[in-house]
Amino acid sequence: FVKHGYQVEVYPTQQRLDAKEKVIHFAYQYDMIVCSGGDGTLNEVISGLMELPERPVLGYIPAGSTNDFAQGIRLPKSMIEAASVAVNGMQISVDIGGFGKKKFVYIAAFGAFTDVSYMTPQEMKNILGHPAYIIEAVTKLTSLRTYHMSVSYENGNVEGEFLYGMVTNSISVGGFKGIT
């Protein structure tokens, strides 16, 4: 970034929603914000940007356990190559979803296993990567329950008991391809 004339300021997030709050309060000071993290960190940054009337350019360097969203938009797996994409300005448009008043770029879901990404200890994710999520999901098997839900869409309505529901714009969720 420095070689391309950018002044770099680094902020390591400290807790959940930290990235969103920092973006809301400080984004106006920057021409570009580059998020380096996983799907959750990216979602926080974008959620913060969506609350602003004027938004800086967003770059993304995937550095999480699964990086589903980055795969979907075909970002390089190499952090150096992804940084090059951010610096050289290859822009793409992505859909931003809404779930009530909340915005999301990757997934909005309810039901079985939706808390797994939040409940999996960071240390486990750092050591095991994607398998850490699977281990955490297995611990949830005995507490599965259904949710009564009514879903309205353009051509109708579906009502019933659901174990899981999601809306996503990714080709994979939780590292699993083909379930979207």
PLM regions: where:
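ATP/NTP phosphate-donor binding region
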Residues: 1-36, 43
